[in-house]
């Protein structure tokens, strides 16, 4: 599952402004999709990467579950054609990452790449 804690950390540390989400089409068969939004270790909740890596050795992911879209999206060519659940999923990931998700792929072919902000 998508680990929003680690992605947010990587985006901050590396000064990212945008992300790409690939293989969104692969999730189309799932009734629900989980996103790791925090970790729990020894009764403490971590919503950011802990200062000491050793915490991860015993940490358990805390997931938020979103509804899946359960349909084929491989023919979608722009963000607005995606099912509402897929758009909500991307928006949720973007909010957690703290940066834009500007590229989304819905298959292996070049024309299956959606540039969300290009007009």
PLM feature segments, named:
Residues 1-119:
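Non-transmembrane, aqueous-exposed alpha-helical and coiled segments at domain scale
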